[in-house]
A protein has these predicted regions:
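Histidine/cysteine-enriched polar flanking segments
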Residues: 1-240
């Protein structure tokens, strides 16, 4: 069976491959130079992926990702919005898929993503948090987030929610990163964290919330949880 394809921050690609390479192929991200440097290599700032082999990509990195991902059978769609350096111009592609819904701050969202979702009948919910994808880990019908607006919208949609403390996640160049940016689905029943969950004050609660839903956890011992712009699956070998 074909393994999943992931895009991961090029600055951490070797560490990510060492930690999670057994789960699939890890492709280094293409830096998007219109974004601020700390997030310029974050996949979730320039890509929207449905994990079923369609990726909507920001114009500045479209050709680079076409070369990187086309050999794996990934379909690339060029977006219309070039992400800016500052918030909220930088979050056009930052859309969270969770439990069959899509969550984002839709004003300023990439129109190709909106069109993609509407054609598939996926219900969109507005949240105040522009970094929707970064701010939440979604798996099955469950969401883990520190953001109140995402937690509220997800709960109102019937999803199971664990709300955690903000912070406690490294993102060099900023005060802190987000739980979604430090994690991702690795296979049909495994959630990965780039760092050690034991170092997070809610680590035990996070692990229990995940395992109670029949998923296992794969983290990186002794490493601080680090926001790498999501362990972004762009093509899966299973139904998501």
């Amino acid at each position: 069976m074909n393994q999943p394809i992931f895009v991961a921050d090029c600055r951490y690609i070797e560490a990510l491959r060492e930690a999670f390479g057994r789960f699939g192929t890890f492709v280094p991200s293409a830096p998007c130079k219109t974004l601020a440097e700390p997030e310029s290599c974050h996949p979730d700032m320039a890509l929207y992926a449905d994990a079923e082999s369609t990726v909507i990509c920001a114009p500045p990195v479209y050709e680079a990702y076409r070369r990187l991902l086309s050999p794996f059978g990934v379909t690339l769609v060029q977006g219309k919005i070039t992400p800016g350096r500052d918030y909220p111009e930088n979050v056009a592609y930052n859309v969270l898929n969770a439990g069959g819904f899509a969550f984002a701050k839709w004003a300023g969202a990439e129109p190709q993503i909106v069109d993609f979702l509407e054609k598939r009948g996926i219900v969109r919910h507005h949240v105040a948090q522009g970094y929707a994808r970064c701010s939440a880990l979604a798996f099955a019908d469950s969401v883990i987030t520190a953001d109140p607006s995402i937690a509220r919208a997800a709960a109102d949609s019937g999803l199971s929610v664990l709300q955690i403390e903000p912070g406690h996640i490294c993102l060099p160049g900023y005060d802190y990163g987000f739980i979604g940016g430090a994690s991702g689905l690795l296979d049909a029943r495994t959630v990965g964290f780039f760092g050690d969950l034991r170092l997070h004050p809610n680590g035990d609660a996070i692990r229990s919330f995940i395992t109670a839903r029949g998923f296992s956890v794969c983290d990186v011992p002794h490493r601080p949880l680090t926001d790498v712009g999501t362990i972004l699956m762009v093509k899966s070998s299973f139904s998501v």
